[in-house]
């Protein structure tokens, strides 16, 4: 653990300063004895020597620092709050802040800052820890070798946790040179520093531990590089480093997890599962020593792989197994202290990173949403959003749960086709007075609040509006200029962690503008193009929800904003025109609505491919084909430009009806019907045909359309009706007539 070497280095620093200050031999001997006792794990003797030092020199705060670290280790690293409080007091006593470190004179306080950075790391305050670590890195040259390595390893870990991969890779190159140079100096007899490996038995679990042998340090560097390349999806570079990891670490659980993650990115899902199953997680140290529940990570990674394969039910099973393992691990930890001053005490400091419950809840919610169980997904995601409330993507997923829960889920809709059931609600009366009651098509817009506040987390359209408003507010207000690439709707994300912690805020001072992102924990951060795609998705959902709630002005406003987006996919552009037209019709602006319903507005209905996926495919560098992803998500309706233009024509006909332009409406209806198969005609179009025939006085033809539940060509049917009685009672069964396709009828 990083604090381990901090304690050793603190004592060594005190000894070095004693030599410079000309203090007595007694103080030197006590300092040396304290260091030896600490290294040997004899913390009682170490504290005794430090107490004697404090009696001699009461003004040296380094003695107090070393005593605090020794007390921390004596308690088996369970007094985190006390150590944090002592460090804060010492910082106030020396009147020094991290921002004030501007010269080498402040290097003497480096041990204090480093220990604070380690505590911030375990408290998941990553940005604060990075701020301290970067200040220390500026003065790394005068540091001793072991301490310099510790600072670099800690910073690398923090950069990876905050997705600053370029900084992490740069620092790894520097660290590699430092280790090679130090090894060369040792071989030449230039380094006479005493090196103890007594505390290196927990190498992999220790964060930022620089006092390790060269081979172990090289292996650790290779593992960090693999994690960085996996984040960058640079598969060629990752493949080279994976070989180095396997050569240096063998078939250890961390190396096999990393290789499995690599195969997962390549699309070799079966191989990824095989690698996970071959890892002997039973031999890996327990979470009490490392802070990492390997069993939890094992099941979580299996869930992610099966999610990518399209096996969502199996993926959900594995995520629930991971959640069960996580809860079992947390149950073994002492309950949280009610005293705010001892919130993090009573448990080893490394176990502060053990609980991954909310990441797993997020994964379960996404899986359930894909399965088609929005209400169950809502329950999981509502709990996750209490922690990850700054994630705009998560708020969108919550809104999608609400929309799906309040939307019809007929069998035809799930297959991507419109429903044609429910045109006739009932039949009333008898004989001459027999009437057909048509079902209302606007039932889905009748929402009830039941007097409850819309802020209460319930899967309602009112709560969906709040979620979407939050998502829009969390996205950057200013449009970011980007390269001219084809955008796409943001896809659902799951977390695939091998030894990861919780994501946090990230630095914005990146070297390349294209790499700017906003955090979206627990999933990966949103890159520039993903932000634009997500904004388009949110605007489309807001317009839909506003229409459902009857807020037509809000719907029109957001639909127009959607159409103004520079990187708009074809499918969302189609929806934008439809939502804008519906809002305008409700506002009695039919002429403006007709402009939006022009079929020529639809030229593409694809969801698009994100740049990240394109880069991943181009960087594959392999001749072997990727595995099939299993059961794919069905294409949303409409699945083609023809279907989309047909939908536009049906709606355009409805708009013409509102202006009593029935001839134009009939032309739109017949033109649309000739473009698609009769079974794909939506029920709204059939009702429109019934309305037009009633307006034209063709009652019998309207009845025939209702009975057959399909459109009928007017000319053919009128000629048939002249040869048959004009009226048939509704209770008599009618023999089905095989009707020709619309194209054939029109040719005749």
Swiss-Prot record:
Component of the CCR4-NOT complex which is one of the major cellular mRNA deadenylases and is linked to various cellular processes including bulk mRNA degradation, miRNA-mediated repression, translational repression during translational initiation and general transcription regulation. Additional complex functions may be a consequence of its influence on mRNA expression. Is not required for association of CNOT7 to the CCR4-NOT complex. GO terms for biological process: mRNA catabolic process; negative regulation of translation; regulatory ncRNA-mediated gene silencing. Component of the CCR4-NOT complex. cnot10 and cnot11 form a subcomplex docked to the cnot1 scaffold. Belongs to the CNOT10 family. The keyword Magnesium does not apply. GO terms for cellular component: CCR4-NOT complex; cytoplasm; nucleus. Residues 487-509, 605-615 have a biased composition (Polar residues). Keywords: Cytoplasm, Nucleus, RNA-mediated gene silencing, Transcription, Transcription regulation, Translation regulation. The gene is cnot10-b. Residues 1-25, 483-524, 605-634 are annotated as: Disordered. The keyword Cytoplasm applies. It is found in: Cytoplasm; Nucleus. It comes from the Eukaryota. Residues 1-16 have a biased composition (Basic and acidic residues). InterPro entries: CNOT10 (IPR039740), TPR-like_helical_dom_sf (IPR011990), TPR_rpt (IPR019734). Its main location: cytoplasm. This is CCR4-NOT transcription complex subunit 10-B.
